[in-house]
Amino acid sequence: MNDAECLSHLLQVCARKTEEFVRTLDSKHMVWLLEIEEEARKMFSSDFNAEPELMPKTPSQKRRRKKRTSIVPDENRDPSGRRISRRRSSANWSNSVRRLSIRNQNKTNEDSMQEEPAQPKRMTRARAQASIMCPSVVEMALPESPSQLYQKNVQVTISEQDRRSAEQKLVGSATEESEMKTDVLPVPKIAKDTISEIVNTVVPPPVPETPAVPVTPENKSRAAAKLKIAGSSTPIEAAEMVDLTCESPRPANELANEQPLNLTNQSVTPTGSKSDRRSVRRSLVVVKPSSRRSSLASQFSLASKRESMTREAVRKSIRQSIAKKKAAMETSSASSQRSCQSSIEIIDDEITIKIRPETAPSESVSEEAHTIESPRRSLRSRTFKKIAISNLPDSEEPQRRVTRQMVAMDAEPTPETTDDAQNIRRKSYKRAVDELSDDERPSEGERSPPRKKTPSPPCPPSKIVKPPPHMKSFLHTVQKNQLLMMTPGSIGKNIMMKSFIKRNTPLKMDPKEKERQRLDALRKKEEAELQRKQKIEEGKKRKQEELKLRREERLRKVLQARERVEQLEEEKKKKIEQKFAQIDEKSEKVREDRMAEEKAKKKITAKKQEEVECRRRQEEEARKLKAKQMEEEERRHQDLLQKKREEEELERQKKIAEAKRLAEQRQAEQERERQREQQLLAEKERLRAERERIEREKALQLQRELERAAQEKEQQRREAEERKKREQQERLEQERLERLHKEQEAKRLQEEQQRKAKEQAAAASAPVMNVTVDMQNSPACESYEMTPKSYKAPSVKVNEENYGMDLNSDDSTDDESQPRKPIPAWASGNLLAQAIRQQYYKPMDVDRMYGTIDSPKLEELFYKSKPRYYKRTSSAVWHSPPLSSNRHHLAVGYGLKY
């Protein structure tokens, strides 16, 4: 029984593991394989140029995938941040037209299509993105490849109402009428030769005289709007096989001859613009896919929508530009130069229109074949070759030529028309210059006619064409560069410099020569365009081959990695199976061991129960004994507690009595302390009174000493005055004596001189020979002393009290240890202390003695102003007096002597 349960459990585990493995295959590996298949199909398609995107496996790949752009671009999002180049102006314009047209087509498709219930299913990333981008299109898998669909015939079922409207609209072909009588219409496979034969059978219809854009009425085109031409095997072929020659309404028989009938399975009439309703008349017959599912996928694919809407927008814009150009050419009659240019442009259009009926079928087939090879061809070549003149309706009447004579016959232009014509001329010139690439533009000699040496006839001022300013500067720069590039060897002696000044008067030119030049220029442009296209195609093919090689290498590496992963998974599965087998064996052994353990445990538990019962009885007896012991212990404990409480009560009473005794002692101590403090206060008060008395006595003694010192000073002053008076009297007496002595000496000298004069006179009168002179009795010997004493001025007594105030003192100070003069008595000792006390207690009023001294103004002293003059320094004004406390500190610092 246990073996059967284990076997059933093992089968359940295996079934669950198998289901998980199948679910993993369906949810992961099959999705990977589908994605690889989609990427491979994209790689081998002609318009694939993106990198293959697979589902991310690691977090880094997921983050990298967030930074990439989507595989299917958002058609409703306008690009931003792109630089607009002059060379790419037409391509950017076509891109913007394509985006706007696709938006409108998406809105139309959302209104016209019927919503079908979508079933939940597993989708790859590309399908999910396609369903997000086109929510109205029902996502259906393509069971067959495009090559298989192309080999099948298509059967399309239509309603009776559609059939009747088609019979009314498209009558004229017996074979097609017989096909329309049946509800099921087989559409055979059509080769390219058949397409070329159908195109060759197209006859250009007559065109009315007025070249205007036709407007088809609503009621006539509504029935025909339901008819859709079957798409090609691929969306690229269906998008490229479009004929742009038919723009005007044509008869029903021509439409029947041109278009074989092929109807879709849509039952809703699409509501769109008139150009959308006329799309039936602008298409060729191609093969329809085999089923409704593939028809929807090819009909509503983004590539076919994008190409069809691009062509429609380009066609509409070219119709508008050509209509504006024609209206401007008809209304404008400017100068002969502008009319000549307009006639050249119109002749170009006429020649292209004339050539169109013969070359249209072959060109359309060749252009379609070329477009299938390279679907992303530039819009400039399309507009230049295929679309530029196809909007002009054909006519059986002779073409209307606008020549120089017809323009000359027009009326005189008004200023407004002249300005309009000039603006149109400039715009057309700029457009022509932009449409030509650098290597396609004709040279200066090809663009301008040969000049004549004869002077041109005068032209009225109103018809003079002045080149625009940028052309003047451009031509001037070109001529200057040519002159700079010339070498001295390349210029001959007799060669004259070519003038770069352009003549404003128009020059006559042969129309045949001009036509030949125009055809040559057109041929050169076509050749250059073909070469450029070939180079572009070669570059694209080379890049596509390189991309394919890279993708193949990348896919090969991915497949190798997948194989390695699968091998690792297989090994892991084998290991898991082995582990499961080992686990089963171990579980069997464990189960047997568990059964034996359970039996042993049962025996052990029985023994344990008996032991527990015995132990319980013993514990019950022990508990009873313990309860008795606890009661006795509790009783003893209560007795002890009672005794303890009594002892604590006695102890508490003792503590209270002790506390009372301590409180009384503390109170007595506080009382004694208070008395001691009162005694100390009284002693302090007595000492303070004694100190005040002593201070008063000291003050009185100091006052008496000061009075005594003042009296002594007064006495000294009087003594000094008396001494000065005595000295002055003595000095005056000495001066008087000296003056008398001088007067006596002067008188004696005068008398001596008189006597000498008399003796000389007597000697002169008497003979002097043999006369003996007695020197001793001579009065000359007694006239003066032989060694007179030197005169000594009386010495002035030095006042010892006047220290350092004489003229002999210099700026240097004395040394304290060795003064040059004796220190006076009033500068030391008791006299100094008395002077300080007197100045301290009775300071003199300096302001009353010397008057108020104003603070010096340093600006007036030095005749200038400096910031330091206003700072509190020794050389500046002190705005605030020194603190009064400093004065007290100075006085106390000397230490008064008592």
From Swiss-Prot:
Report the main location listed first in the record: nucleus
Name the Gene3D superfamilies on file.
Answer: 1.20.5.3600, 6.10.250.2990
User: Localized where?
Assistant: Nucleus; Chromosome; Chromosome, Centromere; Cytoplasm, Cytoskeleton, Spindle
Which GO cellular component terms are attached?
Answer: chromosome; chromosome passenger complex; cytoplasm; kinetochore; microtubule; midbody; nucleus; spindle
Give me the stretches of Low complexity compositional bias: 90-99
Q: Where is this region: Disordered?
A: 50-127, 251-282, 358-379, 406-470, 525-548, 564-677, 707-770, 802-824
Record's keyword annotation contains Flavoprotein:
no
One annotated GO biological process: cell division
Composition bias of kind Basic residues appears in 60-69
Keyword list, A-Z: Cell cycle, Cell division, Centromere, Chromosome, Chromosome partition, Cytoplasm, Cytoskeleton, Kinetochore, Microtubule, Mitosis, Nucleus, Phosphoprotein
Which residue positions does Phosphoserine occur at? Answer: S874, S875
Q: Where is this region: IN box?
A: 807-881
Question: Which residue ranges does the record annotate as region SAH?
Answer: 512-730
The protein's job, in short, is: Component of the chromosomal passenger complex (CPC), a complex that acts as a key regulator of mitosis. The CPC complex has essential functions at the centromere in ensuring correct chromosome alignment and segregation and is required for chromatin-induced microtubule stabilization and spindle assembly. Acts as a scaffold regulating CPC localization and activity.
Listed PANTHER family:
INNER CENTROMERE PROTEIN (PTHR13142:SF1)
Protein name according to UniProt: Inner centromere protein
Identify the species of origin. Xenopus tropicalis
